[in-house]
């Protein structure tokens, strides 16, 4: 019994470069990092799935990034830990190549997703009028699919079939590494394409994004808050619709007056005909006003502070006229590129002085929307998204740079890099997948609150968490 125990200890000592307590320590640390990576990225994916406020184009890119990081946490980290503590690759050449292909495809997909996020924000800032038209969920899905397909094409065939291309497998039994990394030209090319070029592009893009954002914030601060137009910059749209006069409601009652205060008015069976179908806005910042006027004189339309008084009249006359004005101010979602939209909809019937009365009501209500705004801080959604991109970019550069520098050095001087340093550099790339979910939570309060609700099993109203 003692002989068999001593034999197993001697075998471990011969194969593993680490002592027993070091192996235990490495397994505990690596296992913990793998677990945190898995939990963190599952939280990101579930949060985007259950919280409608996180279901934005920008966060769909983060969802794809979380998928890549989850695969790294489940497979790559644990297989590399096994390889490290044992001291040799025990699973054979086929599994070795499959692991390397999966590892590099997923890692490159992460880089591609970061590039997409950077380009997306860059176009949002530099082309705010033309890019939002193309920025749809379908387009986001196509870009994400392209990132994964391109990553697969770049890495998987070369890793899996290089031994057949050159006619021999030079990777020795018990070892697992990419065979073509022994070729200096190929190594330089892949390192530049997979790391250095993306980093340069992302850095330049972020510089432009940051400059444009600071310029916009500085411009907003220069304008006096009290004189700011709450609707500007906006796109004001108006359209006139003529309803069927035969459906006009009639009543024996005289002229009634309904006051709309703070954008809300009590509904009754008559006003319902005019205000029904009014567009509902999902954003808390959105406002909508419906004003109904009929058979009114110019002086019957009055305006007070935060109040619109409109006259609603009913007549037995079949030719009675009715005008409905709908104003909606649309505020974009947290990652939206689009400017604020104010829509003025005029619904009325034709008749004597009909157009004139529509114009009167429209002028009065549009004038109301342009009253001086109360003291209101500038929106921080743009700063929030820019800050998230910066955090992800910095985390990527810091964790990936050491390994990619060592890859270039290893091409000319393999003995120059100790195994321990190489292992740490390789693990730093994996740790990037652990850090990313923390970046989302630190830079986005909605992610942070949703994470908290999920971890504490508070599922009530989680879909509306902001």
Swiss-Prot record:
Q: What is the effect of changing residue 103 to E?
A: Reduced affinity for acetylcholine. Abolishes signaling via downstream effectors
| PTM text | Phosphorylated in response to agonist treatment.
Bilayer-crossing regions = 23-45, 60-80, 98-119, 140-162, 185-209, 388-410, 419-442
- Where is the region Disordered? 218-355
Cytoplasmic-side stretches of the chain, per the record, are 46-59, 120-139, 210-387, 443-466
Spell out the SMART domains in the cross-references: 7TM_GPCR_Srsx
Mark the residues carrying the PTM Phosphoserine.
232
Keyword match Coiled coil: no
| Entry GO CC | cholinergic synapse; ciliary basal body; cilium; clathrin-coated endocytic vesicle membrane; dendrite; Golgi apparatus; membrane; nucleolus
Q: Which UniProt keywords apply?
A: Cell membrane, Disulfide bond, G-protein coupled receptor, Glycoprotein, Membrane, Phosphoprotein, Postsynaptic cell membrane, Receptor, Synapse, Transducer, Transmembrane, Transmembrane helix
> Could you state a single Gene Ontology molecular function term?
G protein-coupled acetylcholine receptor activity
Expression induction: Up-regulated in response to enterovirus 71 (EV71) infection.
Subunit annotation: Interacts with ARRB1 and ARRB2. Interacts with RACK1; the interaction regulates CHRM2 internalization.
Q: Which disease is it linked to?
A: Major depressive disorder: A common psychiatric disorder. It is a complex trait characterized by one or more major depressive episodes without a history of manic, mixed, or hypomanic episodes. A major depressive episode is characterized by at least 2 weeks during which there is a new onset or clear worsening of either depressed mood or loss of interest or pleasure in nearly all activities.
The protein's name is Muscarinic acetylcholine receptor M2
> From which source organism is this entry?
Homo sapiens (Human)
Task: Identify the gene encoding this protein.
Answer: CHRM2
